[in-house]
């Protein structure tokens, strides 16, 4: 069964960035869907790479998934990967797994050794958009818990993202966390997102202030581009530290485990190299007693489906990400939609990834040329 066509779809589903889906067709067999991670205003380069790599994928056996990733990196990219490249590869790799599952009439997790669980715990993200004050964070948190979520992730810091911030910014972040904890009670897990922004001096001081609110985790307090600094931060605080969303493939995760720089890793199936690579990273983490919380700043459709299958198949899974603000549009473009019940999603049981996209629905959401973001001026910078 050989690949006959590769088609990327770029769509603006109102998520603040364009989303990139990939359809891989075969000569007389099933087709497959994948999703590539994107960032705001960094999507057309990923589409271009999908098209360029796709030209070499056409004519090849759709079942040769491991070899596809091997030659894409070693030969197409000449061993020079980056976010855009690995995002393109990840989407294509997922589509090949979707084809494999459909071909063998089993869900993808059965091809990964079978499930370790029948449902996957998720935390809500995207629920606090526009919140600036503690009261606004608290109100949005109560609403989200009212929808059935028992874990909330949020970035409590004022912008812009900077390595060194003022005491006032530190205090505002702590106040926002305090307000959310008071609003939702002690039983809801709070996941604190830092977005790689801080130097250890800030990250440690803030974490110690937040410890009394019992955060579930502290995500990327320091960039993984400086793992020694991240490890320094981890050693000084009592909140589990997460890293991984800016790392790609096993090669980049190796030193996380060697340095014991994190308690939890959060690779993203849409940019870490795909389904097999996410599982391989989880397997590396397990003997180091590190758990896995897959990042999923993707749609609630294909990217989520791929995440669910890997999450089902790895023993050291913890929790994964679900963007509540992507949910409504996701239901318009995909069938069947995933349902969150009591903070969990049932592991898909249909063949392949277990989800199909509607191309006519995607056409109703053309991509935006630019998000029109406001970039900071010198006057926006802290002293």
Name each model feature, range by range.
Residues 27-103:
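Metal- or metallocofactor-binding catalytic centers and their adjacent structured scaffolds
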Residues 4, 8-14, 27, 299-383:
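Flexible C-terminal active-site loop/helix
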Residues 10-13, 35-43, 89, 125-129, ...:
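Glycine-rich phosphate/pyrophosphate-binding beta-alpha loops
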Residues 119, 125-232, 236-237:
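Metal-dependent enolase-superfamily TIM-barrel catalytic cores that perform enediolate-based chemistry
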Residues 1-25, 33-38:
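N-terminal metal-binding scaffold of metallo-dependent hydrolase/deaminase domains
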């Amino acid at each position: 069964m050989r690949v006959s066509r590769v088609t990327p779809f770029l769509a603006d589903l109102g998520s603040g960035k364009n989303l990139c889906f990939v359809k891989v067709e075969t000569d007389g067999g099933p087709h497959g869907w994948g999703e590539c991670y994107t960032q705001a205003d960094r999507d057309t380069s990923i589409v271009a790479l999908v098209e360029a790599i796709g030209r070499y994928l056409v004519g090849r056996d759709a079942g040769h998934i491991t070899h596809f990733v091997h030659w894409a990196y070693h030969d197409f990219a000449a061993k020079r990967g980056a976010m855009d490249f690995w995002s393109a590869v990840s989407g294509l790799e997922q589509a090949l797994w979707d084809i494999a599952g459909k071909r063998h009439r089993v869900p993808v997790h059965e091809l990964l050794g079978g499930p370790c669980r029948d449902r996957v715990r998720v935390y809500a993200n995207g629920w606090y958009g526009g919140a600036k004050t503690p009261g606004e964070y608290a109100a949005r948190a109560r609403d989200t818990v009212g929808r059935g979520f028992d874990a909330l992730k949020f970035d409590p810091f004022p912008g812009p993202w900077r390595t060194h911030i003022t005491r006032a910014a530190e205090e505002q972040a702590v106040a926002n966390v305090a307000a959310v904890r008071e609003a939702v009670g002690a039983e809801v897990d709070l996941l604190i997102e830092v977005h790689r922004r801080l130097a250890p001096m800030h990250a440690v001081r803030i974490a110690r202030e937040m410890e009394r609110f019992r955060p579930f985790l502290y995500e990327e307090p320091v960039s993984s581009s400086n793992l020694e600094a991240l490890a320094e931060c981890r050693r000084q605080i009592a909140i589990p530290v997460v890293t991984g969303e800016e790392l790609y493939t096993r090669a980049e995760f190796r030193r996380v485990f060697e340095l014991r720089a994190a308690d939890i890793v959060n690779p993203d199936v849409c940019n870490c190299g795909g389904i097999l690579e996410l599982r391989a990273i989880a397997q590396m983490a397990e003997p180091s007693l590190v758990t896995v919380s897959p990042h999923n700043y993707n749609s609630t459709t294909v990217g989520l489906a791929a995440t669910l299958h890997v999450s089902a198949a790895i023993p050291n899974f913890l929790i994964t990400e679900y963007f509540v603000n992507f949910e409504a549009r996701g239901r318009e473009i995909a069938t069947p939609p995933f349902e969150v019940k009591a903070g969990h999603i049932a592991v898909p049981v249909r063949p392949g990834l277990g989800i199909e996209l509607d191309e006519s629905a995607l056409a109703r959401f053309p991509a935006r040329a630019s998000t029109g973001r406001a970039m900071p001026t010198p006057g926006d910078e802290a002293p």
